[in-house]
């Protein structure tokens, strides 16, 4: 793994996606003591402290964030602006990575006062290390910045770089929303199996195994999948 292994990180927001990334980074060797998390919700702060001993969990913006070389924005879109304005003074000079949906990089640059910004659109399989993430970097993000971001998102699965920020909207529809369609079809297959006489556990195992196997087959082929 690259530079983030030795770069202090700050997470603004400590929900499921942040937890998945933090867990992946620690598993890859980043010392927990190099991670700060700002999380306003007290029960979630307690959960993070229990889950990740050594990680510094803060209630709000603090001068402690000034050590961060990379700030990961994992807040809800409606709270992003206020959080950014509160934290901007403590994160001057840092690289910023946002996993918040729908917040354009122009707005982020205005609130944070920097051009070193990368937007990411992950999906829910990232929670188990099998995600697919679309990435867009503003021109002010260097090759080194992009490499740091790649090292971080690699802990949650695969990624693709996009040339246009607007393509993140397409990524949201395709891979961001895609798992919901897979689960819907999976449920339909399971229910069909039960309807035809299989017990629920067997139908579930067959349906999931079919999806896993078909996905592996598609990934191993250079040809586009066809019915």
Question: Would you name each region that the model predicts?
Answer:
Residues 9, 117, 167-173, 226-227:
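Short pre-catalytic strand/loop immediately N-terminal to key active-site residues, enriched for Gly-Thr
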Residues 20, 47, 82-83, 107, ...:
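Phosphate- and divalent-cation-binding pockets in alpha/beta enzyme and binding domains
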Residues 107-116, 132-170, 183-220:
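Internal alpha-helical scaffold of NAD(P)-dependent oxidoreductase catalytic cores
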Residues 32-35, 93-94, 116, 201:
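Short acidic capping loops at alpha-helix termini that bridge into adjacent secondary structure
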Residues 42, 52, 61-135, 139:
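Rossmann-like NAD(P)(H) cofactor-binding subdomain of soluble oxidoreductases
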Residues 178:
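Aromatic-residue-lined binding/catalytic grooves and analogous aromatic/hydrophobic interfacial grooves
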Residues 1-60, 111, 131, 194-195:
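NAD(P)+-binding Rossmann beta1-loop-alpha1 motif at the extreme N-terminus of oxidoreductases
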């Amino acid at each position: 793994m690259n530079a983030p292994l030795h770069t202090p990180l700050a997470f603004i927001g400590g929900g499921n996606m942040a937890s998945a990334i933090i867990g992946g980074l620690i598993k890859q060797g980043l010392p927990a003591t190099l991670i700060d998390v700002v999380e306003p919700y007290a029960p979630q702060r307690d959960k993070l402290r229990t889950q990740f001993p050594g990680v510094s969990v803060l209630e709000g913006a603090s001068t402690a964030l000034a050590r961060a070389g990379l700030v990961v924005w994992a807040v809800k879109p409606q709270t992003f602006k206020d959080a950014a304005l509160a934290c901007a003074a403590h994160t001057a000079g840092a690289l910023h990575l946002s996993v918040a949906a729908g917040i354009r990089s122009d707005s982020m640059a205005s609130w944070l006062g920097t051009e070193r910004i990368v937007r990411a659109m992950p999906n829910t399989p990232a929670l188990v290390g099998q995600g697919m993430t679309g990435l867009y970097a503003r021109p002010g993000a260097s090759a080194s910045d992009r490499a740091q971001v790649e090292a971080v998102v690699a802990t949650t699965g695969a990624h693709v770089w996009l040339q246009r920020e607007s393509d993140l909207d397409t990524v949201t529809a395709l891979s961001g929303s895609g798992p919901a369609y897979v689960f819907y079809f999976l449920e339909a297959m399971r229910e069909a199996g039960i309807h035809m006489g299989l017990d629920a556990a067997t139908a579930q195992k067959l349906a999931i195994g079919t999806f896993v196997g078909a996905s592996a087959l598609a990934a191993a082929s250079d040809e586009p999948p066809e019915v």
